[in-house]
């Protein structure tokens, strides 16, 4: 039986999001044929997941260490930009973007990616809230998404 990781979702073809998987989820992830994982949490992923990435020849980009050691700190613009620069490179795909629960940090990066796709803000925030669940959304993350300047990714010609 294939079991997806918590808060798993397909963002686009070959672009997935989730919370940190455990061993039960590894057979499911194998089917995705991942080339890259973008890990947004400040702490290291679980050792079993690190071993899985090595065994599957998946490149792990640990961006979370760049901004904080506190899991409650909001994601920084620098980390979002680094994640988006990876996400606009075809060589990164298939890719999984994840943090511990696949909610706030992952949702912020996906929300900014949606801005690059020219989604309207209400649709972006609805998707963010759907993965966060209930009233657990963070207004600072929503403001970050709303105010995020897409030109920082591609330059003024965008």
From Swiss-Prot:
The answer to keyword Transport applying to this record is no
Q: Which compartment or compartments is the protein found in?
A: Cytoplasm
Question: Known PROSITE patterns for this protein?
Answer: TYR_PHOSPHATASE_DUAL
Q: Name one GO molecular function term.
A: phosphatase activity
Give the EC number(s) under which this enzyme is classified: 3.1.3.48
Tell me if Cytoplasm is a UniProt keyword of this record. Answer: yes
Q: Where is the active site?
A: 99
Ranges for domain Tyrosine-protein phosphatase: 7-158
What residue intervals traverse the membrane? none
Question: GO cellular-component terms in the record?
Answer: cytoplasm
Keywords from the UniProt entry: Cytoplasm, Hydrolase, Protein phosphatase, Stress response
Q: Where is the signal peptide?
A: none
* Chemical reaction(s) catalysed: O-phospho-L-tyrosyl-[protein] + H2O = L-tyrosyl-[protein] + phosphate
List the Pfam families hit by this protein, alphabetically.
Y_phosphatase2
Q: Which family does it belong to?
A: Belongs to the protein-tyrosine phosphatase family.
Q: What does this protein do?
A: Putative tyrosine-protein phosphatase required for protection against superoxide stress.
Spell out the protein name for this chain.
Putative tyrosine-protein phosphatase OCA1
- Which gene produces this protein? OCA1
